[in-house]
């Protein structure tokens, strides 16, 4: 659409000049000749006719406008800066602003406004372009049919780019009606006229081809809108129309691949992408779209959804390389540094997708477990998309992951003595055991540089999380806000599946209430609530790591007050609040948070869309497994989460010298999990309790065996039934730190 918009606008301008009222026959002839020369591509002749018109009528700004457009097309649409400057001068000359458009006089200036909207569109100033386009749409009735369609198509494209799919569908319905009525009117005229003329039949065939092309374009826009709305049943119907009208062209196959991707048919989506003939595409110099870049990016997204993250990052890097090659070719044509938009076709101003690809790479690298590489990608992307709270959260997660041990390192330490015994010194009677320190809190991460410098530190993570909270709308920061129970799809708190995974269902009644979050999908009401919970949980963790216990307690309390809180984040909220309270010497309050009965659910709150996505499938058509797994740092069950609470509760009782209660908590927790799953912190707690009880030999045996003694286990098993009996066998999990649950 971007490539043919300027052509439409130029043709309309010249025709409008030729039909102006109160002109002489000479002016009318010059105007007609200029228009015909323009439509045939003879821009030199067109400019000559316009120069003659300018000599006759020097006060008509429309002639200057048409001259600027003709010169723009003569340069192969490479003088965008000159056209933009001329449009601004003409706008100041007619003393009109978009907000003041309210009369027929402004309708006469519609070409000027439309041209300005097209320029804004290519400069990615979509909000301003929509403002101009919507003003034009108010006066669409007096416009000629072709120009009215151009305005509508421009607005549809802008609505889809800004994720306003409902508005786009409304305009597409208007366009369908407009094309249908125009076709009927033409058929009526042809019936009354003489159709034996060869030129008339050619014109009729050409007109029919244009109508079919417009209908095909409408079907493609409908598919894009339905994909954004996740309305897959309606999308399936439109996909058939697209394939019937556009055939196996690259755009139609890409749309169908996107549709199959949303349905979960990832292999079919890959097959459709591979079947597209990219070589037949006109190229980015004519369309502004780098199809190879889109191809690799789409493959990366599909493999990300399949949890094949290493393959995904491979394809994203290929897309980045392709994008950089294209940008290098485009920058080679620019000679004047003062005119950054000139020297290349205007449509190529939309070609560069570097920052969108960097965003994708960052999310992919974060899932792979390479937080530093992910940080480098996202910190570059945030310079462009600095108003995206989700992006700031991802940056903070990179900092958190970079400043804690990896999952493999943490898991390797559990079955060995490395997590308990640091070294052994001395010999014989003087032989001593040096226990490993488990304290990782209050670490000074800053090495003297400003925390505002973008490095993957915990101080910078705190800044990122503060930015994310400030970017959330104020109405979402009220925990007493109405829950909005009509939303049917609840999404996860702290995991991002893909760029489209967090898009709300079209069934939501709050579909038009969202905040933009480019380059990913916009944040709807329910997603904002989930996002805020994730930000608060991360903020509490970072504050604890930095030793800011009051701030950590504040964030944890706010997290627990949220009306829609997943079980896993509620579990984290209680643990973070308890740790902050213990550091503040408010142990009694901490014990309240560490009550195992507080844990009734450890779900991530992710509600898959499989039912909605699979509802339009055939009976024998199965949904592919995405292979997604819940993060291993979360307890796998309520039982294991309560075990963590009991271990921490035992620590709290030790601080109050209530050793009997601490021992009871330890034994109760140990009876609920496999001996190999007991974390080193729990073994150290048992050693501490035995030393306090004067049982030095028993403490040494615990250290030697690296597990709780069988006698201790037997004592708890004597009871007929544990307090928290596991319903099913507990799978091995990665236990968190003793009073800190680390999270990805």
From Swiss-Prot:
Gene3D superfamilies: Tetratricopeptide repeat domain (1.25.40.10). GO terms for biological process: mRNA catabolic process; negative regulation of translation; nuclear-transcribed mRNA poly(A) tail shortening; regulatory ncRNA-mediated gene silencing. Keywords: Acetylation, Coiled coil, Cytoplasm, Nucleus, RNA-mediated gene silencing, Transcription, Transcription regulation, Translation regulation. Residues 484-495, 602-612 have a biased composition (Polar residues). Residues 1-25, 183-204, 477-521, 602-634 are annotated as: Disordered. Residues 183-199, 496-506 have a biased composition (Low complexity). It is found in: Cytoplasm; Nucleus. The modification N-acetylalanine is found at residue 2. Residues 74-107 form a coiled coil. Belongs to the CNOT10 family. Component of the CCR4-NOT complex which is one of the major cellular mRNA deadenylases and is linked to various cellular processes including bulk mRNA degradation, miRNA-mediated repression, translational repression during translational initiation and general transcription regulation. Additional complex functions may be a consequence of its influence on mRNA expression. Is not required for association of CNOT7 to the CCR4-NOT complex. Component of the CCR4-NOT complex; distinct complexes seem to exist that differ in the participation of probably mutually exclusive catalytic subunits. CNOT10 and CNOT11 form a subcomplex docked to the CNOT1 scaffold. This is CCR4-NOT transcription complex subunit 10. The lineage of its organism: Eukaryota, Metazoa, Chordata, Craniata, Vertebrata. The gene is CNOT10.
């Amino acid at each position: 659409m971007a490539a043919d918009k300027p052509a439409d606008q130029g043709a309309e301008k010249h025709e409008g000049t030729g039909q102006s009222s109160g002109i002489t026959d000479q002016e009318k002839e010059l105007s007609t000749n200029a228009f015909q020369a323009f439509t045939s591509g003879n821009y030199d002749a067109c400019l000559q006719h316009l120069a003659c018109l300018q000599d006759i009528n020097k006060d008509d700004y429309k002639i200057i406008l048409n001259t600027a457009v003709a010169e723009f097309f003569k340069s192969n649409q490479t003088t965008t800066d000159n056209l933009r400057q001329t449009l601004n001068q003409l706008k100041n000359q007619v003393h009109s602003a978009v907000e003041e458009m309210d009369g027929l006089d402004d309708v006469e200036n519609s070409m000027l406004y439309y041209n300005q909207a097209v320029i804004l569109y290519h400069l990615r100033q979509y909000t301003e372009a929509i403002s101009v386009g919507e003003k034009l749409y108010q006066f669409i009735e007096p416009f000629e049919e072709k120009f009215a369609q151009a305005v509508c198509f421009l607005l549809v494209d802008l609505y889809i780019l800004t994720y306003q799919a409902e508005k786009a569908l409304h305009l597409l319905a208007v366009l369908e009606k407009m094309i249908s009525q125009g076709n009927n009117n033409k058929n009526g005229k042809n019936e009354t006229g003489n159709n034996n003329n060869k030129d008339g039949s050619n014109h009729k065939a050409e007109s029919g081809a244009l109508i079919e092309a417009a209908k095909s374009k409408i079907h493609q826009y409908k598919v894009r809108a339905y994909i954004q709305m996740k309305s897959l049943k309606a999308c399936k119907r439109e996909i058939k129309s697209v394939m019937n009208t556009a055939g196996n062209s690259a755009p139609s196959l890409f749309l169908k691949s996107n549709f199959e991707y949303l349905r979960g048919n990832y292999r079919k989506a890959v097959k459709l992408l591979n079947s597209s003939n990219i070589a037949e595409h006109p190229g980015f110099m004519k369309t502004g779209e780098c199809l190879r870049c889109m191809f690799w990016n789409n493959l990366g997204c599909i493999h990300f959804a399949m949890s094949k993250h290493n393959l995904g990052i491979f394809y994203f890097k290929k897309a980045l390389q392709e994008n950089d090659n294209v940008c290098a070719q485009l920058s080679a044509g620019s000679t004047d540094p003062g005119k950054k938009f000139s020297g290349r076709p205007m449509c190529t101003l939309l070609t560069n997708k570097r920052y969108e690809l960097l965003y994708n790479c960052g999310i992919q690298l974060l899932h792979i477990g390479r937080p530093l590489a992910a940080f480098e990608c996202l910190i570059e992307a945030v310079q462009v998309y600095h108003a995206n709270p989700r992006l700031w959260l991802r940056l903070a997660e990179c900092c958190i992951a970079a400043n804690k041990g990896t999952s493999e390192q943490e898991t390797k330490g559990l079955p060995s003595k490395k997590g308990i015994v640091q070294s052994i010194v001395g010999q014989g009677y003087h032989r001593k055991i040096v226990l490993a320190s488990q304290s990782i809190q209050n670490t000074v991460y800053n090495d003297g540089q400003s925390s505002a410098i973008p490095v993957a530190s915990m101080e910078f993570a705190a800044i990122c999380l503060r930015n994310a909270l400030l970017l959330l709308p104020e109405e979402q920061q009220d925990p007493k806000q109405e829950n909005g129970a009509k939303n049917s799809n609840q999404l996860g708190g702290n995991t991002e599946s893909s760029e489209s995974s967090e898009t709300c269902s079209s069934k939501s009644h709050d579909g038009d209430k969202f905040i933009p979050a480019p380059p990913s999908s916009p944040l709807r009401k329910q997603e904002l609530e989930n996002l805020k919970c994730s930000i608060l949980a991360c903020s509490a963790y970072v504050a604890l790591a930095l030793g800011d216990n009051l701030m950590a307690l504040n964030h944890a309390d706010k997290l627990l007050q949220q009306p829609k809180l997943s079980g896993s984040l509620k579990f984290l909220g209680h643990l973070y609040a308890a740790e902050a309270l213990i550091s503040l010497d408010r142990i009694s309050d901490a014990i309240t948070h560490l009550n195992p009965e507080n844990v009734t659910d450890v779900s991530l709150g992710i509600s898959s869309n499989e039912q909605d996505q699979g509802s339009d499938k055939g009976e024998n058509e199965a949904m592919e497994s995405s292979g997604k797994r819940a993060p291993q740092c979360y307890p796998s069950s309520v039982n294991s989460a309560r075990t963590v609470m009991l271990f921490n509760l035992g620590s709290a009782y030790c601080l109050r010298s209530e050793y009997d209660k601490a021992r009871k908590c330890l034994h109760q927790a140990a009876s609920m999990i496999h001996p190999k799953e007991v974390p080193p912190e729990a073994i150290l707690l048992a050693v501490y309790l035995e030393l306090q009880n004067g049982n030095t030999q028993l403490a040494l045996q615990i250290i030697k065996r690296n597990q709780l003694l069988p006698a201790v286990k037997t004592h708890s098993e004597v009871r007929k039934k544990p307090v928290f009996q596991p319903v099913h066998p507990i799978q091995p999990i990665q236990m968190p730190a003793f009073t800190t649950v680390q999270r990805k």
